[in-house]
Regions:
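Acidic side chains
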Residues: 10, 14, 71, 121-123
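Conserved Radical SAM active-site core
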Residues: 2-5, 18, 36-95, 99-108
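N-terminal pre-triad scaffold of radical SAM enzymes
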Residues: 3-30
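Radical SAM/AdoMet-radical enzyme domain recognition
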Residues: 97, 104-125
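Short loop/turn motifs at secondary-structure junctions
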Residues: 30, 61-62, 113
Length: 125
């Protein structure tokens, strides 16, 4: 189960092309200037199963996926499971933004691209 603030379909602001953006609840980083401070509290989200989220992602044949938030890696097992399920069942590209520690991410994920940024990291599965 993952705590999710929102799922936005067919957005063009969270990565290249059309995306399904999944906004995670919960973030320990408290970055200065955060554009989603309401996402810091994990209890503000709605608990959703990986299968429930996966169905929404796979329903759009054209959009790739962005994990945002909050910090998706505040819930590393769930988002890693979701990323792997998306890759197993589709050709979608999955991007993620996070301020989480790099070596944790590299151990958990099949990373094909890594681009660090101040208090934010983008990673593609």
């Amino acid at each position: 189960m993952l705590s999710i603030l929102d799922i936005i379909e067919d957005t063009t602001v969270d990565g290249p092309g059309f995306r399904t953006s999944i906004y995670a609840a919960g973030c320990p980083n408290r970055c200065p200037g955060c554009h989603n401070p309401e996402s810091w509290d994990i209890n503000r989200g709605r608990w959703m199963s990986t299968d429930e989220i996966l169905a929404k992602v796979l329903a759009d044949n054209f959009a790739d996926v962005t994990f945002s938030g909050g910090d998706p890696m505040y819930q590393p097992e769930g988002f890693t499971e979701l990323a792997r399920a998306i890759k197993r069942q589709s050709r979608k590209k999955v991007a993620r933004t996070s301020g989480a520690i790099q070596d944790i991410l590299l151990r958990l994920c099949y990373v094909t691209h890594y681009r660090p940024n101040y208090c934010s990291m983008s990673m593609y599965w």
